[in-house]
Amino acid sequence: MAIRRILTVDNAADLAVLKQVSKDVPAVDDALRGLMDDMLETMYDAPGIGLAAVQVGELVNVIVMDLAREGEEPAPRYFVNPKITWASEELFEYEEGCLSVPEVYDAVERPAKVKISYLNYQGEAVEEDAEELFAVCIQHEMDHLKGVLFIDHLSRLKRDRAISKVKKARRAA
């Protein structure tokens, strides 16, 4: 396993990759499991609760996630070729952040509940209901696979301020 560099919005080349649409993978094999292991290690190191493959420069429909609270046993989850098959009309607002937009947090409104289908780490087909933080996180990460960042859900002014804040923080570091 290896920690990979997380692409960020303050770097033009990184942003160009982050805005691309990822592709489905044909099968879950050892190479893909290696990528998922690297992604999980990278996410834990950051630290974060979710990471899409595009955030480490891989344009494949893969997400890793761990919603365990501090002090709880780690509970890593893997989502290959995830799809939302149903979304509630009821909305839920949550203050989101993103490892590709460091130190920026803002409220985003999304469907409160979704049904998802995906392949797991072993390549088995899974269908599952998601609500609350799980629903927010899976939708946030699936947006990445479509080239959409959480700041794209904000007004142009807030989005521009967010990118400026990240650039300013990088210069100060």
UniProtKB/Swiss-Prot annotation:
Keyword ATP-binding: no
Known EC number: 3.5.1.88
Binding site for Fe cation: C98, H140, H144
CDD domains according to UniProt: Pep_deformylase
Active site: E141
Keyword Iron: yes
Keywords from the UniProt entry: Hydrolase, Iron, Metal-binding, Protein biosynthesis
Co-factor(s): Fe(2+)
Highest taxon in the source lineage: Bacteria
Catalytic reactions of this protein: N-terminal N-formyl-L-methionyl-[peptide] + H2O = N-terminal L-methionyl-[peptide] + formate
Protein family according to the UniProt entry: Belongs to the polypeptide deformylase family.
Record function comment: Removes the formyl group from the N-terminal Met of newly synthesized proteins. Requires at least a dipeptide for an efficient rate of reaction. N-terminal L-methionine is a prerequisite for activity but the enzyme has broad specificity at other positions.
Protein name (record): Peptide deformylase
Organism: Caulobacter sp. (strain K31)
Lineage of the organism: Bacteria, Pseudomonadati, Pseudomonadota, Alphaproteobacteria, Caulobacterales
Encoding gene, per UniProt annotation: def
